[in-house]
């Protein structure tokens, strides 16, 4: 047996963590153009078909060779074809998933390089979220019925023992974090509740309710703050202690539901990925309300992983693309959009400015904005397109003529690289020290990537 573990479940697995698909839909091929996009020109596939209980599951490896950027392309080192919603890396060459029969499975990597299920734990309901603590081997599984089951995995990962059940929620559990330093279990659910429990006693310590489903959860152990994203696109910042939960503030910027959060404990940066196809970087530590926008996906952003030492952010989305963002680069805050009744360049009125339309005897125009300066302009005055990597715009965006001249004279080299995941990503987990990335797709496949090239 070699040393890597992945744990998962029908809705949510654990050690290299990924998530189970809502439907099977293989989405191969190119996902659109972008700076530094890797073009797969040769694929070598090795498969070993194993006879497993009901159905045939495919275990194998795929090595990708690319014509462009050969030293900056992640290599697919493992693949498991099985119904999964979540998954994680346990740092032991094992993998956990759950299938349609409401089971949690631990997959061990054999000397042959193939993954084999060593544990198949049947659950009273479908598993929808999961958290695994490597140091204590504690596994917390959130269920579709709102409860949380706690397990202990044996050292050989061939057995898991049930320890405690938490009656935490009245609807599906959508996120769990175990804070080992404080022995806290943080959870969120579709009942619009954030719950804080003690793993030592099993007692509830506090809760907080909002007006929308909670969909994403992150925790900063240093400051004891929890960040909770919801279906309306807002992020609540909560202060936790043994006496309960205190609301601090709300972060508002996204126009779509929050699906994933990541945290940089050193720089105190919060990363949020949304259904509005954008990523926002919130400078929590700076306390100035600064937020940077990252635009590199053509569909919903569903997963974020951050490597603090290398200062790299990995994002995955339903467009089937993994984007590697250089967060060590100097970035500029997104310009605020100015509102005006007339074009701030040529003075022609917009269509709601009836008085100016009558005075100038012309039809009103539609309002647009320059993405660099934020001025309100008409279409004719914002006809130029250019990428602005320093502001997070990796694709061409609308700018005014004046800003276009300025930007063309500056270096606009891309600050991100784009890689085809070959499936629509719904979950990711990163083991940065070992340079391993796990992705789970809507095609019900777990993929384990060697991302050493991205960290060079």
Range-by-range predicted roles:
Residues 72-74, 103-124, 136, 144-164, ...:
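Per-blade loop-tip surfaces of WD-repeat and WD-like beta-propellers in eukaryotic adaptors/scaffolds
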Residues 2-3, 135-137, 181-183, 222-224, ...:
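Short coil/turn segments that connect the beta-strands within blades of beta-propeller domains
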Residues 302-329, 428-432, 436-455:
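Blade-level signature of beta-propeller repeat domains, shared across WD40, Kelch, NHL, RCC1
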Residues 371-390:
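Cys/His-coordinated zinc-finger cores
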Residues 342, 369, 377, 399:
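The −1 position to Zn-ligating cysteines in a subset of zinc-ribbon hairpins
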Residues 8-11, 98-101, 142-145, 181, ...:
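Conserved strand-to-loop turn within each blade of WD40 beta-propeller repeats
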Residues 12-16, 68, 79, 83-89, ...:
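Canonical WD40 repeat/beta-propeller blade segments in eukaryotic WD-repeat proteins
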